Amino acid sequence: QRQMCKETDRCERGLGKEKNENPAPNLYEYKRHRLFDYEPLTAEQATRGTVGIPRVLNMWEDYPFWFTFFTKLGYRVVLSPYSTKAIFEKGMESIPSESVCYPAKLVHGHIMYLIEQGVDFIFYPGIVYERRDSAAADNNYNCPIVASYNENIKNNVEDLKEKNIKFMNPFLSLDKIETI
């Protein structure tokens, strides 16, 4: 007969019952691979140069689209790494406000990383509306920080100007793909 604990329902583990060896898949790891496991063009194949894309805010979800877009145009895509303390510290000098959210503060370090890589230009658009995933969704807009933080970067990361790195930061709407 099964012994049961009211709070955990795991009392039988101490009775020698075998542990389930088929753990649930790590969905975070799965998503990271689906979003970022793309092979960039080689330097020889990239006839138009290199574009840097920061792995930040809305660019996480939109990266497959932008990677494909720039690759088809003949650019080698350079993606900033996953966020770390070292990445955060790279951009600390250009953060203009203590009150902005931490994910936005991380953007500065990702931009600095891409500058250090010597890319031809950095692409970081302001995306007001994302693609509508469901007709039943009430909205598909980004928060004001996500939608406009590219302007903050343009105006506060002085290394962009000092190192003569072109910074492309158009405002786009992904809810009507034909407008891109």
Where are these regions (language model features)?
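An N-terminal assembly and electron-transfer interface module characteristic of large anaerobic redox
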Residues: 1-180
